[in-house]
Amino acid sequence: MVISGSRDNSVMLWDIRSKTLEPAQCLNEAKDSVSSVRVSDHEVLTASFDGKIRRYDIRVGELYTDYMGDAVTCASFTRDGQCIVVSCADGVVRLMDKDSGELLGEFTGHVANNLCLESSVDTQDTRIISGSADGKLWIWDLVSQKVVTRLSGFKPTKHPIVSLSVHPQTNCFLATNGPSILMWNTTSMQE
């Protein structure tokens, strides 16, 4: 399966073995553009500018929704699958309990400027990483919620860092500000 989210408010599941150009399933619950899609085992997690994160359990066909109060630019699972990291247009990254929806932490300081910023956890589930409009990567301790570091390996830093990807097993991640892509080691935070 390939899963896509779109500005037309839909999430489509495509069977790549099929000879048809039609999606196998279309999920139309979002009321505004779908900003991110993440998949973990049997769950599909979507974020939308309608202010909601939606978690589809495709094993049993159930939908779980949490309202965040502002447009959601990115949502991702923690590595242990127990929590969800949520970036919102209000400039706050939130850590939510996946099952109860309880707010476990808020991470602030980075600059959102209404950009569609991505955030994630590191490989060990100990740090929150987020892009920022100030051209830096902001990293917080997951438990204390304090800023660990701000990485600024991009020269010049006039471009916002909007996209990042954490390697699922190795202690490294990639980030881009548009014209450049850099890789960091999360253990030493060296470029």
Segments from the language model and where they lie:
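Structural hallmark of WD40 beta-propellers
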Residues: 1-3, 42-45, 62, 81-85, ...
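Short C-terminal beta-strands that terminate individual repeats in beta-propeller domains
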Residues: 5, 23-29, 63-68, 103-110, ...
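Conserved strand-to-loop turn within each blade of WD40 beta-propeller repeats
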Residues: 5-8, 47-50, 87-90, 131-134, ...
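WD40-repeat beta-propellers
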Residues: 11-16, 53-57, 93-97, 137-141, ...
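Short coil turn/linker residues within repeat-based beta-strand modules
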Residues: 18-20, 60-62, 100-102, 144-146, ...
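Canonical WD40 repeat/beta-propeller blade segments in eukaryotic WD-repeat proteins
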Residues: 31-39, 70-77, 113-120, 158-165
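Loop/turn-rich, solvent-exposed surfaces of beta-rich toroidal or solenoidal domains
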Residues: 87, 91, 102, 110-142
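Blade-level signature of beta-propeller repeat domains, shared across WD40, Kelch, NHL, RCC1
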Residues: 162-191
